[in-house]
Swiss-Prot record:
PROSITE patterns associated with the record: RIBOSOMAL_S12 (PS00055)
Disordered, as annotated region: 106-135
Family: Belongs to the universal ribosomal protein uS12 family.
InterPro entries in the record: NA-bd_OB-fold (IPR012340), Ribosomal_uS12 (IPR006032), Ribosomal_uS12_bac (IPR005679)
Signal peptide: none
The protein, known as: Small ribosomal subunit protein uS12
Organism (species): Hydrogenobaculum sp. (strain Y04AAS1)
Keyword Ribosomal protein in record: yes
Basic residues bias spans: 111-123
């Protein structure tokens, strides 16, 4: 433990917060171009084919991004908007693609949590038909 004189002379060292999404360089989102779109298998207790894309960001950094939601229209050379946020069961995937922005289409027929998947609000008649005409 330092003495009062040592603290006056040196001061305490600030703990630097390490960024969880360093490729974004402090920005909330970054634009990028898909270099490769493919699937990967998750870590041990889970089993699936998760859709991911290798994206070259506008700052030149290349990152692996998760494509959320069911189905997507992405292919090589698609322009995408990338945000931070890791996928727990995919090692090395620390970014997500924003659905409904730039070349990425929103999720079709999405009824709940629509804003997270870039889905437009369904028409009133269509919503009634899918629910089975409840009054």
């Amino acid at each position: 433990m330092p003495t009062v004189n040592q603290l006056i002379k040196e001061g305490r060292e600030k703990i630097k917060k390490k960024s969880k999404a360093p490729a974004l360089q402090g920005n909330p989102q970054k634009r990028g171009v898909c270099v490769r779109v493919y699937t990967v298998t998750p870590k041990k207790p889970n089993s699936a084919l998760r859709k991911v894309a290798r994206v070259r960001l506008s700052n030149g950094i290349e990152v692996t991004c998760y494509i959320p939601g069911e189905g997507h229209n992405l292919q090589e050379h698609s322009i995408v908007l990338v945000r931070g946020g890791r996928v727990k069961d995919l090692p090395g995937v620390r970014y997500k693609i924003i659905r409904g922005a730039l070349d990425t289409a929103g999720v079709a027929n999405r009824r709940q949590s629509r804003s997270k998947y870039g889905a437009k609000r369904p028409k009133a008649g269509a919503a009634q038909a899918t629910k089975g005409g409840k009054k």
